[in-house]
Regions:
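Secretory-pathway/luminal and periplasmic proteins that interact with or process carbohydrate-rich
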Residues: 108-117, 156-162, 179-193
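Short, functionally critical alpha-helical segments immediately adjacent to catalytic or ligand/cofactor-binding
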Residues: 87, 95-111, 146-150, 173-179, ...
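Substrate-binding/active-site groove segments that recognize
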Residues: 113-137, 144-155, 205-207, 232
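Bacterial N-terminal signal peptides that target proteins for export
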Residues: 13-25
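N-terminal export signals and maturation junctions of secreted/periplasmic proteins
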Residues: 10, 29, 34-87, 112-113
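Alpha-helical transmembrane segments
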Residues: 2-8
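Second-shell loop/turn segments in exported
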Residues: 69-76, 86-89, 112-114, 132-143, ...
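Catalytic and substrate-binding regions of cell-wall glycan-acting enzymes that process beta-1,4-linked
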Residues: 55-60, 171-236
Length: 237
């Protein structure tokens, strides 16, 4: 059945493929879940099918061709130096290492010496208070940064009580990582009296429409958070 779906995906045009995926998303999800797709480089029929689906999903992402190419190039080079550290940190804090690595790529493109004008630094671009809260003494140390970022994401996941699906919860965790848990909580409280019923789409709309002292004429802080969430999810999936 899964092989038939893959063959069909290759035989139809791109716009038709989008419709095809939407109609058969549940079937694809069930098959992939049952087969427990892995991103480890072990070549099996299942891994080939999973790789094909991943490529299709990436093709329909909102990333530009340049961004996709950059991600692939650095995945084959820079990521390899730190891959085991991502795997070990993710296992320690019960995360998927690909998810952790996707956050790091969006933050720093896996550059341990990355800095921003807002004084966040390192592989996971931690703020000074966040770094202190997870025991990171040197934000430019890639190992400390990876483990600190993993711990922080794990803590956020435990704190987030929003979203009506696992995908929604992941989006809320990412939003909190970028915007801060307090700001996300305040936004959720303004949307609905029952936080557990708030969806990511509702928060996304609220963030885009809300105003902040950090906004510029062309780019709002809320839009920045939405872009962060969507890009990480594109890199991750």
């Amino acid at each position: 059945m899964l092989l038939w779906l893959i063959i069909r995906m290759f035989k139809i045009k791109k716009i038709q493929t989008v419709k095809f995926l939407s109609k058969n998303a549940v079937i694809l999800f069930v098959f992939i879940s049952l087969m427990s797709c892995s991103k480890d480089p072990v070549v099996t029929p299942v891994s080939v099918y999973c790789s094909v689906i991943s490529e299709k999903l990436l093709a329909f992402s909102r990333l530009s061709n340049f961004e996709k190419q950059k991600f692939q190039e650095l995945s084959d080079t820079r990521l390899q130096k730190y891959k085991n550290d991502f795997i070990e940190a993710a296992e320690t804090f019960d995360l998927e290492w690909e998810f952790l690595a996707a956050v790091a790529f969006q933050e720093s493109q896996w550059n341990p010496k990355a800095r921003s004008a807002t004084q966040v630094k390192g592989m996971m671009m931690l703020t000074l208070p966040t770094a202190a809260s997870v025991g990171v003494t040197n934000r430019l140390d890639p190992i400390q940064s990876i483990y600190g970022g993993a711990q922080y994401l794990s803590e956020l996941r435990q704190m987030v009580e929003y979203g009506t699906s696992s995908g929604d919860k992941t989006a809320f965790v990412l939003a909190a990582y970028n915007l801060g848990m307090t700001n996300v909580k305040n936004a959720v409280d303004q949307i609905n009296g029952n936080p557990s019923k708030v969806t990511w789409l509702e928060l996304e709309e609220h963030l885009i429409q809300s105003k902040s002292s950090m906004d510029t004429e062309s780019y709002s802080r809320g839009q920045q958070t939405v872009d962060f969430v969507e890009r990480v999810r594109d890199y991750y999936y």
